[in-house]
């Protein structure tokens, strides 16, 4: 077992019940362009077209052969584009009767002997290939490529996260089948990373290996697991995939159709009853959270408070791979001389508030940043929350000034936005390190 000694478990109120309930009916779903880094679509449908579940809706000009399919049957009611015509979302009104595209199905014994090309082709044709992510760069891999290893995390340490075991227990066989399929994509191991007391049987066997991680967030981040087990570089790539996506892949190959089921936790201080709900892939957040929020001006975040996106307007749908929706109150108000208050109801990593004497206290965080952008001040906060074997202050400085050579030497290629989310949270200068990292990664990739 690998113990993570640095990090931060954010003491935010609104943890979900660790049991699954039926969610509200979903009337629309969407494929969000922002879920796919560097993707440039060639549209295969128009507004008003009727599509089947699993039907091709666009392909990627940048990565030849990658197909994106519809998560539901129905009518395409909107294709939203933003600045420079960047695709924001393709919105589909869900039909009452769902027609779907079918694919080949296999028995458990057949899965173990499937040809790699056949596995890749079915994943690509169904659109489930887009569930895979590369390290470095965090992109959908090119069809025909082979990773050094594949990582699956069944440990989620994000604030207010649902325990993956709750979902996997209901779909254990499909999860095992999904791991078998993933093992056909690589000659290396398929790593299943779990917590020390995960209430699940072992999945190890054949190419599938297991490792336990314990400690504070980001102990559950796949970037942490990759750093300790199979570090990447410009000439070495690994892939990762979420635990619910492994289940979906398993069902695709055993049932011959796309699974649109998803379990998403409704969490946060503004949720009336935080709990896990059954819903659909890409569900509308308005449908999902209907009648579930406290009164007030609320912000819905698709994902964790540390690394989700603001689900509103043309992107008011759940991300393809998200496992939670977090509700926060908009922090419009400003507090006069708040920095000299005792801080019984305020949280800080540093020992500056009275709340430090109240271990276990949960806070109703809002969206306020408690100040505007200012100079980056190294006060030791980054080192407190960064468990990886890198120099965070030096790396962050290199990222801010765009020194890609230094950033590469300091370990930037091992990171994605989620790996720097705690650095963003504790930063006295209010820097958003996720977008800064992404700009640097784009430059590094372009320069080779």
From Swiss-Prot:
Coiled-coil parts of chain: none
MF terms (GO), sorted A to Z: oxidoreductase activity, acting on NAD(P)H, quinone or similar compound as acceptor
Superkingdom per UniProt: Bacteria
Keywords per UniProt: Ion transport, NAD, Sodium, Sodium transport, Translocase, Transport, Ubiquinone
Enzyme Commission identifier(s): 7.2.1.1
Secretion signal span: none
Catalytic activity: a ubiquinone + n Na(+)(in) + NADH + H(+) = a ubiquinol + n Na(+)(out) + NAD(+)
Biological process according to GO: sodium ion transport
Pfam families (alphabetical): NQRA_2nd, NQRA_N, NQRA_SLBB
Function in brief: NQR complex catalyzes the reduction of ubiquinone-1 to ubiquinol by two successive reactions, coupled with the transport of Na(+) ions from the cytoplasm to the periplasm. NqrA to NqrE are probably involved in the second step, the conversion of ubisemiquinone to ubiquinol.
Record family assignment: Belongs to the NqrA family.
HAMAP family named among the record's database cross-references: NqrA
PANTHER family reported in the protein's UniProt record: NA(+)-TRANSLOCATING NADH-QUINONE REDUCTASE SUBUNIT A (PTHR37839:SF1)
Subunit structure, interactors included: Composed of six subunits; NqrA, NqrB, NqrC, NqrD, NqrE and NqrF.
Protein name: Na(+)-translocating NADH-quinone reductase subunit A
């Amino acid at each position: 077992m690998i113990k993570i000694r640095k990090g931060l478990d954010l003491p935010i109120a609104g943890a979900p019940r660790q049991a699954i309930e039926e969610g509200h009916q979903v009337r629309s779903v969407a494929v969000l362009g922002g879920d796919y880094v560097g993707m440039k679509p060639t549209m295969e449908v128009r507004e008003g077209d009727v599509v089947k579940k699993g039907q091709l809706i666009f392909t990627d000009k940048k990565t030849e052969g990658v197909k994106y399919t519809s998560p539901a049957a129905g009518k395409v009611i909107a294709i939203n584009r933003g600045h420079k015509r960047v695709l924001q979302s393709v919105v589909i009104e869900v039909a009452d009767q769902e027609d779907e595209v079918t694919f080949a199905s296999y028995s458990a014994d057949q899965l173990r002997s499937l040809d790699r090309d056949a596995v890749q082709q079915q994943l690509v044709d169904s659109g489930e290939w887009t569930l895979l992510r590369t390290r470095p760069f965090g992109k959908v891999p090119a069809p025909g490529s082979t990773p050094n290893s594949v990582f699956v995390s069944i440990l989620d340490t994000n604030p207010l996260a649902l325990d993956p075991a709750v979902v996997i227990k209901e779909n254990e066989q499909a999860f095992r089948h999904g791991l078998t399929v993933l093992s056909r994509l690589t000659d290396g191991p398929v790593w299943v990373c779990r917590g020390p007391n995960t209430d699940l049987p072992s999945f190890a066997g054949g190419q599938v290996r297991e490792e336990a991680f314990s400690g504070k967030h980001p102990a559950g981040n796949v970037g942490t697991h990759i750093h300790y087990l199979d570090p990447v570089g410009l000439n070495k790539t690994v892939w990762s995939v979420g635990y619910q996506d492994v289940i979906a892949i398993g069902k695709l190959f055993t049932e011959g159709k796309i699974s649109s089921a998803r379990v998403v936790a409704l969490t946060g201080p503004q949720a009336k009853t935080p709990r896990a709900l059954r819903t659909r892939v890409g569900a509308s957040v308005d449908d999902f959270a209907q009648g579930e929020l406290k009164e007030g001006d609320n912000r819905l975040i698709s994902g964790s408070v540390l690394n989700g996106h603001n689900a509103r307007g043309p992107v008011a749908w759940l991300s393809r791979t998200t496992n939670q929706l977090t509700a926060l109150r908009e922090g419009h108000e400003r507090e006069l001389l708040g920095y000299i208050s005792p801080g019984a109801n305020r949280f800080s990593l540093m020992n500056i508030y009275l709340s430090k004497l109240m271990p276990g206290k949960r806070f109703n965080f809002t969206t306020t940043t408690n100040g505007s952008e200012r100079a980056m001040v190294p006060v030791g906060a980054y080192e407190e929350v960064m468990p990886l074997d890198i120099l965070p202050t030096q790396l962050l400085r290199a990222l801010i000034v765009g020194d890609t050579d230094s950033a590469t030497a300091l370990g930037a290629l091992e990171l994605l936005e989620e790996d720097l989310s705690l650095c963003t949270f504790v930063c006295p200068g209010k820097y958003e390190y996720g977008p800064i990292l992404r700009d640097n990664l784009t430059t590094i990739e372009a320069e080779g």
